[in-house]
Every structure is written in C-alpha cells, then in structure tokens.
C-alpha cells in the first residue's frame, strides 16, 4: 500500500508540474493576469475538469507556480554564492543575483512589468513561502532576534519587488544602492560586529 501511495503522489506531482510548465509557456507570451484556466488546460493538453483537480482556482495555480519558481531560484542562487563567505558580501551578491535571474527569465519578468497589473509584487508581498525562504537566508548570515529577522525578510522581499518593477539606471547603480542602503541595515548585527573586529551579541 505504501508503494502505491508513493506512486500516486509522484504521478500527481508530475501532472501538476506539467500543468505549471504549460502555464509558464503562456506567461512568456502574454500578460499573466490575462491568462485563464481554459487556455492553461488547452496548453497542458487536459480538460478543465482535470486542471481543477490539481488547482482549484487560477489564484491557486499562480501561487503554486510562483512558489515552485521561488524554490528553484533559491537553489540556483545558493550554488552561485557558495564561494562567498563574508555575510555582507553574501547578502549583496544574493540580491543582485536574484534580480538578474528573474529579469533573465521571460516568464518571471512578465510578472513585474509596470504596464500590467502588479500581480507579481502582490503575490510576493503576501507569500509566506517567499518570506520564509528570505528569513532562512538571512538567518544563515548570522544569529539575530527572530522577530527582527522576520521583519527584515519581509522588507527585503518588498525591496526586491520594487527594483524589479522600477529598476535602477543599470546594474552598477543598483549594486551601489543595495550596498549603501540595504546591506548595512539587513546584515545581522553579529556579522557586522565580527567584520568590525568586535564580538557579536551572545
């Protein structure tokens, strides 16, 4: 029975991924806010009834897609910054890498176009998954008060969505702004103290 349950769960996961892959192809072609469930079902090669078995609403499908891509980006970013050790630099590189990777992905970049409804920013702002991943990353930089980390994580998400919708003049300009206005505030106090040559808080 356990083996059957595992196979069933795996088939469900594969079917859901196939639907999300079809939705992603549509997101590269048109405004994500304008794409309905009928179009996604057709692109995925399934019926509406089948689509609704996996995602009970368009909002649920969008959320699943955003969370899948957020986790994927998170894994790729951790690989890219694996050799960066110093916490402040690690934070800076992770933010600039996130911006670059989202912009380089047409399906993701479409969610942050200012000429369309700001669904990317809205979803990022209310996603517990995105906030939790941001908080986990900040925790990896050094110990700090959990409430402070959670608040900073939410602020980092808002800062990222703001830059995705309203970019700086170029990458160098954005990097300078992040280094000046974000890194000193968001880097944990313990890490900042170590860099300054002082022991951090116990």
From Swiss-Prot:
Signal peptide: none
Domain annotation HTH tetR-type: ranges: 13-73
Gene3D superfamilies the UniProt entry points to: Tetracycline Repressor, domain 2
GO MF annotation, one: DNA-binding transcription factor activity
Protein origin, superkingdom: Bacteria
InterPro entries referenced in this protein's UniProt entry, alphabetically: Homeodomain-like_sf, HTH-type_TetR-like_transc_reg, HTH_TetR
Alphabetical keyword list: DNA-binding, Repeat, Transcription, Transcription regulation
SUPFAM superfamilies assigned to the protein according to its UniProt record, in alphabetical order: Homeodomain-like
GO biological process, one term: regulation of DNA-templated transcription
Keyword hit for Ion transport: no
Protein's UniProt name: Uncharacterized HTH-type transcriptional regulator Rv1255c
